[in-house]
């Protein structure tokens, strides 16, 4: 198998986090991430980008992709849709709390570079979910009843806090922010996975007109299921894999049979999760890969898992990172036109922070870790 990796920029003293990655039609890669003195509380946070020309060894100097001065611009994702429109999604944090996130997007058709794409449109993903407070309260009640005694006090405090926010119209509509790239289904529908830190669950923004207008799916209410990555099975079923944000220590998973409008129960996959982001992609071979921290504690191990049965089992695992310390996390993963798999992730070590890009193939994953 093939594998190569490099840092996108030299280790940097500031906070650099949450990458997106896309392959452009000419074969170059474009990566996005945010940089600043912190996260939601830092008003100097901007969205940066860098390019890797096809066949090149080094990435370009970083350039600005988005900056709303005075506001933190956070989690990024990039996407090239079927019509070759380039999308950048990211949230602007209005009051330095995640619950005030408003997801913005920019589109471009002139993106060959150098530097930032020429943006031709900027908009907001305005969402008005159908009132979900009754359903959420019902699910909270049954979830609480099933909570083991040792976690009961923590769960009660968590649900009390969420309960107060459930009836608030503004909080139901604000705070839905992106992390993983959208999925374009075979019908052409855009499915943008979003999550709320107010409620600690997820929701999809759906567009059937190429992103001109967006509407909210029914929320995926599992309390502690955030940052979904969505993959489509051959039969059209959508599967959402989510970061665990509660006490279960496993990847959360839900399925939709109607293109993301409604979702079944949020369950757990047989994959460990320490409360960190993951991403997945359906390969040209029909196999699926998931890039995730495969521990219950810490982010110093980053794995690629491969499934041959569309996510039912994950028999092959190989590590991008398995270190004693550091954080290697928040991956974004795509497959290029030539079959190469590209994973980009936040790379935090003692000396600073960067994004790391790894390029590999399916054979490399199958071979497993070197002894």
Predicted stretch roles:
Residues 1-371:
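Asp-box/BNR beta-propeller blade signature and adjacent active/binding-site loops
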């Amino acid at each position: 198998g093939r594998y190569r990796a490099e840092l996108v920029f030299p280790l940097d003293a500031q906070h650099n986090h949450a990458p997106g990655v896309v392959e452009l039609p000419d074969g170059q890669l474009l990566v996005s991430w945010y940089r600043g003195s912190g996260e939601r509380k830092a008003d100097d946070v901007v969205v940066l980008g860098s390019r890797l020309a096809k066949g090149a060894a080094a990435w370009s100097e970083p350039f600005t992709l988005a900056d709303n001065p005075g506001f933190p611009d956070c989690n990024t994702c990039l996407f090239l849709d079927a019509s070759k429109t380039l999308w950048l999604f990211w949230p602007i944090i209005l009051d330095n709390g995640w619950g005030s996130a408003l997801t913005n997007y920019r589109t471009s058709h002139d993106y060959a570079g150098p530097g930032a794409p020429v943006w031709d449109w900027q908009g907001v993903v305005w969402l008005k979910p159908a009132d979900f407070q009754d359903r959420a309260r019902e699910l909270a009640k049954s979830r609480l009843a099933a909570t083991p005694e040792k976690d009961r006090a923590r769960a009660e405090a968590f649900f009390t806090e969420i309960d107060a926010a459930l009836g608030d119209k503004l909080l139901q509509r604000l705070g839905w922010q992106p992390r993983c790239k959208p999925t374009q289904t075979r019908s052409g529908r855009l499915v943008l996975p979003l999550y709320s830190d107010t409620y600690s669950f997820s929701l999809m923004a759906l567009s059937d007109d190429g992103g001109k207008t967006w509407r909210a799916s029914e929320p995926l209410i599992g309390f502690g299921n955030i940052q979904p990555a969505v993959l489509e099975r051959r039969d059209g079923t959508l599967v959402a894999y989510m970061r665990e944000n509660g006490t279960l220590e496993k990847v959360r998973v839900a399925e939709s049979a109607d293109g993301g409008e409604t979702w079944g129960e949020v369950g757990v996959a047989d994959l460990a999760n320490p409360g960190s982001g993951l991403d997945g992609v359906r390969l040209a071979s029909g196999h699926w890969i998931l890039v995730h921290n495969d521990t219950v504690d810490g982010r110093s191990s980053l794995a690629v898992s491969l499934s041959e049965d569309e996510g039912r089992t994950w028999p092959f695992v190989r590590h991008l990172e398995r270190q004693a310390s550091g954080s290697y996390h928040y991956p974004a993963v795509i497959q290029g036109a030539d079959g190469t798999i590209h994973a980009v992730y936040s790379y935090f070590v003692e000396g600073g922070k960067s994004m790391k890009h790894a390029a590999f193939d399916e054979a490399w994953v199958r071979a497993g870790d070197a002894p």
